[in-house]
Amino acid sequence: MARSLRKNTFVSNDLLSKIDNLNMNKEKKIIVTWSRRSAIVPAMIGHTIAVHNGKSHLPIFISNGMINHKLGEFVPTSIFQGHAKKDKKSKNEKKKN
């Protein structure tokens, strides 16, 4: 279900204040955050934000195409290891016996 239009996009206050300080000083530093639910706003363009994936912080460079998406969309929380392979060797041994 989509978010109501009368509500603004959510951005963590701490994250927004860090972005504003860097923009005022015209600095480019990596910002570390745990706020995966924060939306990407135009003030963040050009910055690198390290978002927590549950284990470590992964850096994301913010570009124009990412506006109005959430930070957590760009950092996977789990890695697909593949499906379990069938053990053919044990089946062949059972058939021979």
Swiss-Prot record:
GO cellular component: chloroplast; mitochondrial small ribosomal subunit
GO biological process, one term: translation
Intracellular or extracellular location(s): Plastid, Chloroplast
Predominant place of localization: plastid
GO MF term (any one): structural constituent of ribosome
Xref: InterPro entries: Ribosomal_uS19, Ribosomal_uS19_bac-type, Ribosomal_uS19_SF
Keywords carried by this UniProt record: Chloroplast, Plastid, Ribonucleoprotein, Ribosomal protein, RNA-binding, rRNA-binding
Chain's gene name: rps19
Annotated protein name in UniProt: Small ribosomal subunit protein uS19c
One Pfam short name: Ribosomal_S19
Matches recorded under SUPFAM superfamilies: Ribosomal protein S19
Annotated function: Protein S19 forms a complex with S13 that binds strongly to the 16S ribosomal RNA.
Family, similarity comment: Belongs to the universal ribosomal protein uS19 family.
